[in-house]
């Protein structure tokens, strides 16, 4: 009887391990350890001391406004995730930048070894102002799970021209006025956008910052990459040594190209950037850019997506490229399938990135096992 009881106890203890999932199923419900669909949209992943931490927007049933904040999940294997709580809570205080009901999107977290702090940046729109604010916001924490302390928000790099502009470039942009263009999308208007029409317009107040990601380069320098200039141009802005301020140095990617949802990684000395076009919540074809320097110049290549519905990025939109720890050259493409009428039911697309002729390929798989793909 004693042996039988011991065996039963062993089996009960072993059940959680036996029930662990091994596969990622893109586009399907993804339960956490408690059986609840993971609620971390537009997010990114940080690896720290043996764990992956997944941060994302908490979505409600009927609104995309932030009613909770930024959630955090933790995993060792990229498949089984445990809910760690709300890492950054929106506030009840009326008039707060992050008042409940604001728009809080695409949170990303990086670790700053100089300060020992975890630093979160996100796109913020003030409650009741639609998408007019176009702010970048920052918060810090002592632990990866938070709580994160909100610091500030605002436009980016006021009174600063792009770092690679010549005096002639600055002089040209300084003559541009939005009032001179009564109609958008004309050839003269497009030329003016490329020359810095909106850079000049927002010179005093700072550059617009919407869809965004963060990237820490091999030398430890951190960068904030975001959609700016009325979502017409991406900007790459250098962060301070503590990762909580912009230094005033920034560069532009694909001026006038209408790119958002940036996701970046580096492989064998070359930077790769996946973006989307600007079609609201609706999916469109992914775009691929590459450069030997984070600061450019960037070259656009065909979409990296292959398989059913590849022309619409499998129904999703890029959010982050996840480097697999301990596996050089192994990356996961992360995207969201948005469902604006039922935001909480939005789904995730996670797919391994392969390389063909040294160019990234994101091929659809109904399901896949990370430990097999990245063995």
Each language-model region and where it sits:
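Hydrophobic h-region of N-terminal signal peptides that target proteins for export
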Residues: 10-18
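Sec-dependent signal peptide recognition
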Residues: 1-10
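Carbohydrate-active catalytic/glycan-binding domains of CAZyme proteins
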Residues: 18-375
